Amino acid sequence: ENFRYIEKDSVGSDDLIYRTVSYVSGNFRKKFSLEEMAHDLGVSKYVLSRVFSKTFHRNFNQYLNDARLSYACTRLVNTSDTILNICLDSGFDSQRTFNRVFKERYKTAPSEYRKNKRRNAISSGRIPRKVDRLS
């Protein structure tokens, strides 16, 4: 009985938010644009752009870079992979772009971040688990 009063827009909006998060989570390691994502989700790029700004309070590129950086940070701390391999595997086009975006977000270089996180883990007795490769 109460379900009759739920507005279609709110349900559709929640569904689009879920599909947006799911899409980025499943594809951030690949190269794709807002336009491609909108096409794949069956919405206009303007609608999708509003989802990012209203729901996540950042634009598409910022949201995508956050997902990529989060993955890269895990790899930096838990693997011995090169920074180049990590940046490319995280979806960045180049190490130069990766370094710039990383420094903007964390105020340090990826190599320093790795050193500091490992040093902190060792000094606190929490040795990071070594992983050859995350999939």
Model-derived regions, located:
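Short linear motifs at secondary-structure transitions and domain/linker junctions
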Residues: 5-8, 37-39, 52
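An amphipathic alpha-helical interaction segment
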Residues: 1-8, 12-19, 47
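Terminal helix-turn-helix DNA-binding modules in bacterial transcription factors
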Residues: 18-26, 31-36, 43, 53-95, ...
